[in-house]
Amino acid sequence: MLRRYCISAILSLVCLVAGAQSAPLVARFDPANGVLPTPNNLLFAGSVDGTLNIPVADPSDPASATVQALNALDGFSTTGPMIATFSSALDPASLVAGVTVRLFEVELENPVLNPATDSPFAVTRVVQELNGEIDFTVNLLATDPAQSTIEILPLRPLKPKTGYMVALTDGILGQASAAPAFPDLTYIFARYERGPLINPDGSSRFANLSDSQAQALEPIRRLVVAQEHAAASAGLRKAHIVLSWSFMTESTDDALRAIRAGLTALPFTLAPTGLDTASVQGAGLADIYTGTLQLPYYLDAPTLIPTVVLTTRWRGANEAEITRYNPQPVAPQTLSIPVLASMPNAASGQSQPASGWPVVLFQHGITRNRTDLLALADSLAAAGLAAVAIDLPLHGITDSDNPFYNATMERTFNLDLINNETGAPGPDGLIDPSGTHFLNLASLLTARDNLRQGVADLLQLAASLEQAGFDTNQVGFVGHSFGAIVGIPLLAVDDGLIGPASLVMPGGGIAKLLESSASFGPQIQASLAATGLIPGTSAYESYFRAAQQVLDAGDAINYAQAAADKHPTHLVEIIGPPPDQTIPNSVPGAPLSGTEPLLQTMELNSAGTTQNDSNGLHIAVRFLSGAHSSLLDPGPDAEVTIEMQQQIVGFLASAGTLLPIDNTSIVFQP
């Protein structure tokens, strides 16, 4: 009876305090009706393999595909927002990161690692508190016209496989009345710390809580009590908390590290074509070679069903999802893929060292192919650097008249699934353009694993270089656009295979990057509009949040710091005006999307003059003119192409200790 009185007294107090206003401000929390702050560990409930278990009403409904993709993940986004809803409009000035909105890194009881726990995902301690406006920011959610929803945005990627806890306080005020927020009545029950909500026989201990309600709320109560105890240990008084929740971030690099750990050389051969770069309008300083590389293909190739490329994804043994608990993907087949290489010839004035040519791995951008290497080959050859290029997954040469076309090995698989003129589904008798199906946003897991396959392919190439006679102690990397995006995870997990790297116009936060791209955005928005997702709506933004969560394990932003920590790094950005029209420098409302967030996460110094450092440089160069294609195409601005290529060559040839900047008039001076 005493406990019944205590909880009733608490509820009465809330009602009395709130009685002075017609509509008290309440932090919404009603798990029984699906009203939860997100991301939230309650969405693991019922999982048997450590993946999310978000309810899906009808798995056969195509509209549920996005949720089903989320349910293949072992946690929540490292880059996405945290969201909570209140009962009425909020005063935005009262939303202060680190003051009224607190974010903590915490340790959690992981039921997969500790099956004996009786409190799955309970917070056990605070590791550290994150800094407001340095690690995260908070604002009103733009798509909520009621102005009653808050959005907490990381300014740096959260750690993978890590627990986090959010606590909102009564310093959050209503917009109309300036009155403080209160906890939801359900949350008041959930924070009750004087004992269980149920008796040993399962009946409720409280008159205003039914047996079924108490039974459902009791496991949540244990989590909330643990959260508030942890918050109190960090100096936050429990009486000031109006809502708290916790979540665990997903794994990101586990699968790629598993692949790297088991990596061995596979057959890699090259043969001269009898052509040099003069045959492709170059200076003729490099001879052109073609060959093949064997590699494990962790996706399904379209041997019998062409459309399998639209839905395939990485799987473990027994078709298990790839997670931190099961990181090793199984390759359904080994493919032989085409390789293009360039090597300095006599016209370059260079002689091959006894140890073999120093070599640069080159990765082209989306919708391009391996022949993009040839636009850079002469500059590399003049410095005594050979180069090797392979295609990104689902990319390749589609013109059968191209002398480097390989009819049986192109990784476009000669697919004809769309009309090349209109983009409409259905064959037109022509091979689909290179990369058409690479970022398939209708199957987010496929898009993620096409990115990861690109990394795995480059790892295999790097591990097999010695078979073609290259000097494996002098290996550099150049990635352009999406080639640089794939290159950053490569550099984070390569463990010594590669040295210095030049990353030309990369970007992170892929989902909003694509949506905000002047090149890709209109097509993506039109495709989503055809499914009923309209820009500016809540459903539209929810899709992009989900897309980013799925793509996180293949997104450069989650690998950027590790990549820069391990490699001398040179990053190129076009800031204009106009700025890069393909990979945006930054994206309003998405602080981890674009090139600038990568640059910041990698902690690169901006430079406008020649730089030296015997320990290796970490430099970003911002160009004031040029275009996204300027690395390879002098058309938009020949001076920019010359300067970019000279920077790359000087940087790689010096093992990342020298960055020559000759034309200072076309680069930003910090």
Enumerate the language-model features and the residues they cover.
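Catalytic active-site module of serine/aspartate enzymes centered on a nucleophile-bearing elbow/loop
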Residues: L632-P670
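A short, hydrophobic beta-strand element of the alpha/beta-hydrolase
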Residues: S502-V504
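Acidic, low-complexity Ser/Thr/Gly/Pro-rich repeat segments typical of extracellular/periplasmic
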Residues: Q21-I305
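Conserved acidic catalytic loop of the alpha/beta-hydrolase fold
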Residues: A341, S351, L444-L445, A456-N473
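Bacterial N-terminal signal peptides
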Residues: S8-V17
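Short glycine-enriched nucleophile-adjacent loop
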Residues: V478-G479, A484-D495
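The feature captures the conserved acid-bearing segment of alpha/beta-hydrolase catalytic domains
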Residues: P506-I642
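Cap/lid segment of the alpha/beta-hydrolase catalytic domain
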Residues: T303-A331, L335-S336, Q352-W357, L361-L459
